[in-house]
């Protein structure tokens, strides 16, 4: 109970103290003190015009990234310059992480490479991501090798991939590294187009069937967000993750939120950070989310900040 009273007091104090946006530019101490608290384990926002860090919170904490991995999957596919209209068979045979994972997509049915990319990016379809890797020149292992080589070339020094979907806890990165991935994504306009598609129908062949798919990022449905590229991710180990290239305060930014508590917490944190940047207002964080963050931080400290399955 004493801890609960302290949390309420801290929250009341935070809300009671007026935020002075002019003080942000005056001193580094004022900037640090005025930064908002978030519910997520780590985050970073970078101004894409200047590469200046606007906000960071534990940006170098190495954590599982879940389906954020699919952004790298898409980049490696496009780097290979393979025909986008080629029909690919749904194949997960070399992705053991897929065992027992439900999907509406039928094994061995076929759809174009471009539609595979759409389903992987827009709706985070795991069988689509795995199939893209299975149909890579040189095979599945060559694809994973290319993912890691791409990460290294981008200076993502704390990033590692072992499979293309993000289901493995060993697909890890940091908020800082993921901003580098977002910066690189500017060279892939198709990824931006597909990842921000709100919804679509996918028609498969052999056998023929059609399925509806929707975007996993709820913010793409809001007209007050200008989102140019996005990807969400979730596993129990990674928590809820969100990356976006978007516009905040009339500036293009790369936004990364990792290891958030609750189904909508990563979206709420993105909105909190946007509000702070645009207005200087600090929005409160629910006590349950802060408790989750504290517990995760303790677990990471006990494990020496290594990525482990919870």
From Swiss-Prot:
<comment type="function">
    <text>Cell wall formation. May play a specialized role in remodeling the cell wall. Specifically hydrolyzes the DD-diaminopimelate-alanine bonds in high-molecular-mass murein sacculi.</text>
</comment>
<dbReference type="GO" id="GO:0043093">
    <property type="term" value="P:FtsZ-dependent cytokinesis"/>
</dbReference>
<dbReference type="GO" id="GO:0009252">
    <property type="term" value="P:peptidoglycan biosynthetic process"/>
</dbReference>
<dbReference type="InterPro" id="IPR018044">
    <property type="entry name" value="Peptidase_S11"/>
</dbReference>
<feature type="signal peptide">
    <location>
        <begin position="1"/>
        <end position="25"/>
    </location>
</feature>
<dbReference type="GO" id="GO:0004175">
    <property type="term" value="F:endopeptidase activity"/>
</dbReference>
<dbReference type="GO" id="GO:0071555">
    <property type="term" value="P:cell wall organization"/>
</dbReference>
<dbReference type="InterPro" id="IPR012338">
    <property type="entry name" value="Beta-lactam/transpept-like"/>
</dbReference>
<keyword id="KW-0378">Hydrolase</keyword>
<keyword id="KW-0573">Peptidoglycan synthesis</keyword>
<feature type="active site" description="Proton acceptor">
    <location>
        <position position="70"/>
    </location>
</feature>
<dbReference type="GO" id="GO:0009002">
    <property type="term" value="F:serine-type D-Ala-D-Ala carboxypeptidase activity"/>
</dbReference>
<feature type="binding site">
    <location>
        <position position="231"/>
    </location>
    <ligand>
        <name>substrate</name>
    </ligand>
</feature>
<dbReference type="InterPro" id="IPR001967">
    <property type="entry name" value="Peptidase_S11_N"/>
</dbReference>
<feature type="active site">
    <location>
        <position position="124"/>
    </location>
</feature>
<protein>
    <recommendedName>
        <fullName>D-alanyl-D-alanine endopeptidase</fullName>
        <ecNumber>3.4.21.-</ecNumber>
    </recommendedName>
</protein>
<keyword id="KW-0574">Periplasm</keyword>
<feature type="active site" description="Acyl-ester intermediate">
    <location>
        <position position="67"/>
    </location>
</feature>
<dbReference type="GO" id="GO:0000270">
    <property type="term" value="P:peptidoglycan metabolic process"/>
</dbReference>
<keyword id="KW-0961">Cell wall biogenesis/degradation</keyword>
<dbReference type="GO" id="GO:0008360">
    <property type="term" value="P:regulation of cell shape"/>
</dbReference>
<keyword id="KW-0133">Cell shape</keyword>
<dbReference type="GO" id="GO:0042597">
    <property type="term" value="C:periplasmic space"/>
</dbReference>
<dbReference type="GO" id="GO:0009410">
    <property type="term" value="P:response to xenobiotic stimulus"/>
</dbReference>
<comment type="similarity">
    <text>Belongs to the peptidase S11 family.</text>
</comment>
<dbReference type="GO" id="GO:0006508">
    <property type="term" value="P:proteolysis"/>
</dbReference>
<dbReference type="Pfam" id="PF00768">
    <property type="entry name" value="Peptidase_S11"/>
</dbReference>
<keyword id="KW-0732">Signal</keyword>
